[in-house]
C-alpha cells in the first residue's frame, strides 16, 4: 500500500489558517470466491463467557399438559381414533406448562411440586368452581366441585383416583369397597365422548374442551328403528323400543367435545389385581351385549347420537312346550274377514253376538298371554341379574369398567356377607376339615432344651416350664456327687 500526502496552504490570515489534505489509498484486489469449507460455517463459543442467562432446557418448551399414570406397565391413553389399552393405576402424574389451567376434582389432589430449580410452587393459584351446577343437580342429582390450578411457571401434580371429600361424585366415590383406576382420553376434535358414570370425570384440561350435561334418551331414534326393521332375521317389534339407559334415578350424562385431555376413573376389583378399565372397538354393524352399569363411556357424534346405537335387551325365555322357539315377540298371523251381509233375523243376531263374544274372549287371553310372557321375562332377568343389559351397535369405541358401585340384586344378597367363616384346612382326603377349635383355643408357648446323654447324644425336648427340668438335672448331679 502506498500513501502520498500533499499539503498546500491556501490563505494565511492572522486570525484563521485553513489547510486542505488529500489522501489516496491503493489496494490490490482480493478473490471473493468462498471455498466449500465446513470451518467457515461453524461458530464456537466458550460457555464461561456467557453470563446472566439460564440454559433453556427441554421442559421449558412444554406447551400442553402431560398425563402419566403411575404404577402401570402399559400405556393408559385412549384416543378418539380407537387406540387404547387398559389401566390399573390409582395415581395420575401431570406435568403442567405455564399459564395452562388444570381442573381436578375437589379432594383428589395429593401433591404439588415444581419442575427442577426453575419452578416455584408459590406461583400456583387455586380457585374452586362448580361447572354445570344446575344441570348436574337436575339430571344427576349431584354437584361436583373442581379445583382450578394455574401458574406462571411449569409445575407437576399428583392426583388420586379417590376423593377425600364426602359426597363428591354423587356419593359413589370414597365409600365403595372397590379400587378405582385411571384412564386418559386425548380428544382431537373429531369424535366426542359420552361419559355415563357421573363420578368418572376426575381431571381435565384444554382451552377448547367443552363439558356439557345432556338428558339420556328413553327411546331409540327413527333411523335406528328403520335399520332394525330391514333386518330380516329380527322379528321383534321396533315401535318405541327403549334404549335402556333412561331411569328416574339417572336422567343425564356428560358429553366431552373439542380438544383437550381428560382423566377418567373407573371401578376396579376390590383385591386390586389386574386391570380394571378396558377398551372395545366395534366395527361397522358389529353388536355387543353389555351391562349398562359397567359402561363407562362411548364415542358419539354430537349430543343426539346416543339414541342411534343403543337398544335395551332382554334375554328370552325358552318355552317348555317348544324349546327351539326362544323368541317371545313373534306375532300370530291375523286373518282379515270380509264383512258379510246377513238378514236381520233373530237367529242371525244371536250368532253374530256369539262370534263377537268369542273374538273378544280370544283377544282378552292374547293380551293376558302377552303380558304374562313379558312378566316372566322381566322376572327372570331380574332374578338372574340380567335386567340392565343393553345392545350396542357399531362403529363405536367403548370403555368398560370391571366393577360397579351398584351391587347385583337377586338371591346373592340374601346370604350375609359379614358372617365370619370358619377356617378350612386341606387334607389328603377328598373332604375338608373344619378347624372349629382354632377360634376358641388360646396359643401356648413351648420351650425347648437339649440334654446330652451317654449313648444317645443330643436329645431335644420341649416343656412348658423349665423348673421341672432344672430340678431333674440338679437331682442327677447330686446323685453323681454322692456316688463319688
From Swiss-Prot:
Lineage top rank: taxon: Eukaryota
Keyword Mitochondrion: yes
GO CC annotations, alphabetized: mitochondrial inner membrane
GO biological process terms held by the UniProt record: inner mitochondrial membrane organization
Alphabetically ordered keywords of this record: Mitochondrion, Transit peptide
Cellular location(s): Mitochondrion
Transit peptide region: 1-30
Family of this protein: Belongs to the AIM24 family.
Entry protein name: Altered inheritance of mitochondria protein 24, mitochondrial
Source organism of the structure: Candida albicans (strain SC5314 / ATCC MYA-2876) (Yeast)
